[in-house]
Design a protein with these regions (language model features):
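Conserved SET/PR-domain catalytic core that frames the SAM/AdoMet-binding pocket
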Residues: 16, 20-26, 57, 64, ...
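C-terminal structural segments of small proteins and small subunits
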Residues: 60-90
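Hydrophobic residues in beta-strands and at strand termini
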Residues: 7, 16, 39, 50-51, ...
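Compact, glycine-rich, soluble single-domain proteins
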Residues: 29-63
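N-terminal first-folded block
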Residues: 2-33, 38
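Generic, ordered loop/turn and secondary-structure boundary motif
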Residues: 5-8, 18, 44, 50-55, ...
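Short alpha-helix capping/helix-loop boundary micro-motifs
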Residues: 11-15, 45-47, 65-69
Length: 92
């Protein structure tokens, strides 16, 4: 079973605490919310994992903050990165 970290009940993305291979079982409980799923694809250590299914335009929330929006349909257990999420952060 692979470990993930998430800090807020509002989060719909978690961080992988080790490399995750396709099909690996992942479990997480945060603030009473329980998640259990198999990884859809390989996810490197430190990268984001989808805790829910996303539709294009859905907000991606990590550590209680909106960090971006889905650019396509994303299945729970998928790698969240620049290929399927656009950042909401603005660099000044």
């Amino acid at each position: 079973m692979k470990r993930l970290v998430s800090l807020s009940a509002e989060d719909n993305a978690a961080t992988a605490l080790s490399d995750i291979s396709p099909g690996d079982e992942c479990c997480l409980e945060v603030a009473g919310n329980k998640y259990k799923f198999n990884a859809e694809e390989g996810i490197p250590f430190g990268h984001k994992v989808a805790l829910i299914d996303f539709q294009p335009g859905d907000q991606v929330i990590k550590y209680g903050e909106i960090i971006g929006r889905a650019t396509k349909t994303i299945k729970k257990g998928s790698h969240l990165h620049i290929h399927n999420v656009v950042s909401d952060r603005v660099v000044k």
